[in-house]
Amino acid sequence: MEKFEILQSKPVMEMLAVAMEYCRFINEIQNYELPEAFDFLQKILPALYLKGSLFPTVEVEEDSANERFVTEEEYETMRVRTAAHLGDRDYFSTVDLANDDINAVPVSLSELLADIYTDLKDFILLYAKESTAAKENAVANCRYYFQTGWGVRVTQALPYIHFVLSAPDEEE
């Protein structure tokens, strides 16, 4: 398959669509009641993971076209806003398999969601540029960050989201 065909392929277009839906939702998460927000996350995160696992490999010819767009300030604003909305549902415990640590460590769901957002928003904005080099970098970065960043974060967030949605109501 030609590089241009890969850059316009179904897996790339589907990833763009799901990533855009995720980023739109995270930007507006405060407009949703928590049960509705958790329900949406339970559906979109597996879709992101599936699309990421099917993502093509692209050889980057011109890495000078590579850019990151989401600033640290934007990241922090989004994380704090999401944490405030999640309230006492923001923190949970998990094990850190990357460091072979079987002891529970605290994790912030808002931080995981902001990390995922940052990688995906950067992918969307870089891919939107006109040049083939920018699109190559966007696709290569999305695959790389799936393997090292946002893909791992999805797998950390999903068990907690499942727990929150399946736990009996405290009022019962």
Residues covered by each model-derived region:
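Short, charged, low-complexity loops and linkers
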Residues: M1-F4, F25-E33, D96-P106
